[in-house]
Amino acid sequence: MLVGQRIGGELIGATMSEVEPGNRLWPYHTHYLNEEWVIVLRGEPTLRTPEGEHVLNEGDVVCFPRGKAGAHQIINGTDSSIRVLMLSSMIRGEIIEYLDTGKVLAKGVEDEDIMFARPGPTPEYWEGED
């Protein structure tokens, strides 16, 4: 549920999610333009970060800064559903890196996907521009 949009939010987004047992909220990733926070509303999700995995409890709040230090993933390793509220800044345009696979997603200012690729050889600046 996109809570932020429903209440007219423009600069801060909020999404409430339920995660069933054995599932993950998203792949392990990091944002380069937007900061995110998680608030645990129900259950005991496992949080994966660059420091490893640890279990969160109801009421816990964690901030994920921009860049690789803020990489994160929410995992439900329990036998009942969990509920979390994700908050984020809403800077238009975004670069998201999926660290397990090396994929990178670039989003435009209208939230459209511009590029979704794995890094490879870097093209020369003028390559193909003739």
Placement of each model-derived feature along the sequence:
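Short acidic-glycine-tyrosine-enriched beta hairpin
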Residues: 50-67
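Short, charged/polar surface micro-motifs in flexible loops or helix N-caps
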Residues: 20-24, 44, 53, 68-70, ...
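Short, conserved beta-strand element in jelly-roll/cupin
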Residues: 16-20, 30-48, 87-91
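Extracellular structured ligand-interaction cores
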Residues: 11, 71, 84
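Short strand-connecting beta-turns/loops that link adjacent beta-strands
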Residues: 8, 33, 68, 79-80
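A short glycine-rich, His/Asp/Glu-containing loop-to-beta-strand
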Residues: 1-28, 34
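Short beta-strand His + acidic residue motifs that chelate non-heme Fe in jelly-roll/DSBH
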Residues: 27, 47-48, 64, 71-77
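Double-stranded beta-helix
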Residues: 75-130
